[in-house]
Amino acid sequence: ATSGPMGWLPVFYRF
């Protein structure tokens, strides 16, 4: 979602 670790949710980790 966003740049960085855990930018949005743990499910989308570094997506």
UniProtKB/Swiss-Prot annotation:
Tissues expressed in: Expressed by the venom duct.
Main location: secreted
Modified sites of kind Phenylalanine amide: F15
A GO CC term assigned to this protein in UniProt: extracellular region
Domain of life (superkingdom): Eukaryota
UniProt KW keywords: Amidation, Ion channel impairing toxin, Potassium channel impairing toxin, Secreted, Toxin, Voltage-gated potassium channel impairing toxin
Subcellular localization, as worded in the UniProt entry: Secreted
Gene Ontology molecular function terms on file: potassium channel regulator activity; toxin activity
Role description: This peptide has moderate activity on some voltage-gated potassium channels. It reversibly inhibits the Shaker voltage-gated potassium channels (Kv) from drosophila (Kd=2.7 uM). In addition, it also irreversibly inhibits human Kv1.3/KCNA3 (IC(50)=24 uM) and Kv1.6/KCNA6 (IC(50)=2.7 uM) potassium channels.
Family according to the record: Belongs to the FARP (FMRFamide related peptide) family.
Note in the entry: Negative results: does not affect potassium channels from drosophila (Shab, Shaw, and Shal), as well as the human channel Kv10.1/KCNH1/EAG1. Does not show activity on human Kv1.4/KCNA4 and Kv1.5/KCNA5.
Protein name, UniProt field: Conorfamide-Sr3
